[in-house]
A protein has these predicted regions:
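Active-site mouth loops of central-metabolism enzymes
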Residues: 2-15, 92
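Surface-exposed cleft-lining segments at the edges of enzyme active sites
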Residues: 5-8, 45, 140
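Catalytic domains of carbohydrate-active enzymes, especially glycoside hydrolases
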Residues: 15-37
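Charged helix-capping and loop-helix junction motifs
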Residues: 49-55
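Active-site region of glycoside hydrolase catalytic domains
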Residues: 57-180
């Protein structure tokens, strides 16, 4: 795959989340969106990284203490290297692994009004996968079918723990290129 340009620390929410959540609270926000990075909490298949899980526990707890409802994104373009090694979302096996991940975080963070976004901007996710060389443009239909199936799996899994939760996806509107 093509080398990805590192973003480095960006806004450094990771180390400044208490300050950032305090700022959000001071603006009167009642919802705060966060992605739970699968690659951080399950860096090896079936092995949970408890240090990272406790980090997310504290972020969610801090968010709720400040009066905000979490809106959790399960995939914001990043997944573990071992998932990439098996073909990413082009491989149906990934759907089972994704279900395992979603089950873990839905059980842990669901309820109390938690909202869920399964995939951040699926079409942009597809474009990103093409750009870095993980898949080809001609893979669009099978890739999107698998992402759609993964969304359904996540929806059912999250609803198992909280039937009243809001579960969806978000969309980015992009120009469509007809020469795939």
């Amino acid at each position: 795959p093509k080398k990805v340009n590192p973003i480095k620390n960006a806004t450094d929410f990771r180390h400044r989340y208490k300050e950032d959540l305090g700022n959000a609270q001071s603006m009167g926000l009642n919802t705060f969106r966060i992605s739970i990075e699968w690659s951080r909490i399950e860096p090896k298949k079936g092995q949970w990284n408890w240090k990272e899980i406790h980090y997310y526990d504290d972020v969610i707890k801090t968010m709720r203490r400040k009066g905000m409802t979490p809106m959790i994104t399960t995939v914001h373009y990043v997944y573990p290297g071992w998932v990439q090694d098996q073909g990413g979302f082009m491989n149906k096996e990934t759907l089972k692994d994704y279900e395992h991940f979603v089950d873990f975080i839905a059980k842990r963070y669901g309820g109390n009004g938690t909202m869920w976004i399964t995939f951040n901007e699926p079409l942009v996710f597809f474009g990103h996968e093409v750009e870095i060389g993980n898949i080809k443009r001609s893979d669009m239909i099978p890739f999107m079918k698998n992402v759609q199936e993964a969304h359904k799996i996540a929806y059912r899994t999250i609803k198992k723990y909280d039937k009243h939760s809001h579960v969806g996806s978000n969309e980015a509107y992009l120009p469509f290129v007809t020469s795939i």
